Amino acid sequence: MKHYDYVLVGSGLYAGVFAWYAVQNGKTCLVVEKRDHIGGNIYCEDVEGIHVHKYGAHIFHTSNKKVWEFVNGLAEFNRYTNSPVANFKGEMYNMPFNMNTFSRMWGISTPDEAKAIIEKQKAEVTGEPKNLEEQAISLVGRELYEKLVKGYTEKQWGRDCRELPAFIIKRIPVRYIYDNNYFNDLYQGIPIGGYNAIIEKLFENCDIETGVDYLEHRETYDSLGDTVIYTGTIDAFYGYRFGKLEYRSLRFESDVLDEENHQGVAVVNYTDRETPYTRIIEHKHFEFGTQPKTVVTREYPVSWQEGMEPYYPVNDEKNQELYRRYEELAKKEEHVLFGGRLGEYKYYDMDKVIESAMRRAEEIFG
């Protein structure tokens, strides 16, 4: 059988960027993917001529010029700007929190008026915030918290905000200007034609096997390569030796609607506790689509169980301590490197995953 320099387990962005660098440096790569397609969570499906983000909305944004130039070398990006809207019991608010939000909520028009209201409400919390609720109120005040943070966050994490640690929300962007651009980054956009074009370029000249669980055939695949790049869950790699790390998962429900424009924006967050989903995505708006039909996806957060897709690491102290024990094992591996959101048990935006893979590749290939 053919022998490879690298066996890459998983085919998301981390594996893809590493594979691209490896091939550029004359190395051979075999990709082993459990799903029936490559691309990890940025994979898109074509439905009615619309590129549907199968695993939730992915909006590329970065301030790293090197990363931006790298992805633009793989695909052309459009000028999509993320400007989601929050729906609280039928009241519509612009996100992130800015003068449009404050004007709608309080009927005010100046930054000084908004600041005065928020500062007064923030003062309710004195001393170090003991939980997420106190942390959020200390950042944005009671009213914004109750309407636009509390319900959404509790659905996301499946717990009351008073039971969640304060560090989950380090900051909440508050802008005293009329600006609905969600991200502060220098660059943002969506690849024209969807993310699949990027994935295909990253894995060009690699051999690929889909529908294969590496962990069930570990000895076979280990024997096929000099080094394994493992981007699956690190606890599963070690057979849950110290116990299972916690993740949050997502469930999606999609519908094709016989209308041209359902909600007028790509993302609407539902911030009340009673609506069971956290948001509705209308995919065509990511690429300014004019198709006669539209595709909408409702997103439901769920607790992760084995066999489900792990999306978000639950980076509380208990899980971080458990991860550190697995990390110690990983450091002793001579022929296995761990990377990506699951391999490093870290919440990564796309640009940070690319940065991480670039760093690793440059350490190895120079």
Give the label of every model feature segment.
Residues 9, 23-48:
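Glycine-rich FAD pyrophosphate-binding loop
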Residues 18-27, 202-205:
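A short, Lys/Arg-enriched amphipathic alpha-helix followed by its capping loop at the start of a domain
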Residues 36-52, 74, 140, 156, ...:
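Beta1-alpha1 glycine-rich phosphate/pyrophosphate-binding loop at the start
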Residues 226, 236-365:
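C-terminal segments that line or cap access tunnels to active or ligand-binding sites in enzymes
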Residues 4, 26, 206, 224-226, ...:
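Short, well-ordered alpha-helix to beta-strand connector turns
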Residues 1-14, 30:
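Beta1/beta-strand and adjacent pyrophosphate-binding region of the FAD-binding site
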Residues 86-227, 231-235:
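Active-site/ligand-binding neighborhood in enzyme catalytic cores
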Residues 57-91:
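N-terminal FAD cofactor-binding segment of flavoenzymes
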